[in-house]
Amino acid sequence: MKYHHGNLKENLIQQAVLACEESGWENISLRNLAKQLNVSQTAPYRHFETKEDLLAEVAAKGFEKMNADMNKTSNFLASGLAYCDFALKYQNTYDLMTGNSLGSFTQYPALLDQAQSAFITLENNLEAHLINLGHSDLPKDIIEEKALSVWAFMHGIVGILRKTETASEDAPASEGPMKIMNNLSKNWDEFIEKSIKNILSI
């Protein structure tokens, strides 16, 4: 099937989004995508000078999806759980979004915009949450600091949760954080909510 040149760019992005989760962003190639879409080997280069330019679009789509998931609820704690759920469901995309493979996001305006929008969503939800708790007079820098702390916690807990997923059930950790995480495995949501509340304590 031939794709009309007018929508080839979006088709390439969507195909790359799927390929990212199926086989990892490292294995994406413009040549393979061109073959899958039945276009010439040079066609993708009319829209993306390099593979990294395409991967930046994939990462931007990831931030857009994560932001949308976080915006589905007005509850701040629930939006934090939505972040973790996204990161665990779309692990390859999340690695691309949060890793160093693309370098500075300033090279990719669309990606930078989506990444900033996701953080602003977290920050705004946090501010609304704190106001509901009676903290309506907090300085902006305190709110930003709290938002960054929550973001860092969620990023860290995702890494630990993924490590826990790959741990062998036949050889559970006997000591240390992995043992604790294994013990908490049936109550992740409760643990995450409690931890975020501790971070937000004022």
Regions found by a protein language model. Give the residues of each.
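An amphipathic alpha-helix adjacent to DNA-recognition modules
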Residues: 9-14, 26, 38, 46-71, ...
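Amphipathic alpha-helical linker/stalk segments
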Residues: 60-79, 98, 116-117, 121-134
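Append "Primarily bacterial transcriptional regulators
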Residues: 28, 32-35, 44
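Amphipathic alpha-helical packing segments from all-alpha helical-bundle domains
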Residues: 107-134, 144-148, 182-201
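Basic, helix-initiating cap at the start of DNA-binding domains
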Residues: 1-23, 31-32, 53-56
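Hydrophobic alpha-helical connector segments
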Residues: 68-93, 140-150
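Amphipathic alpha-helical segments used for helix-helix packing
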Residues: 89-109, 159-171
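Amphipathic C-terminal alpha-helical segment
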Residues: 148-171, 179, 194-202
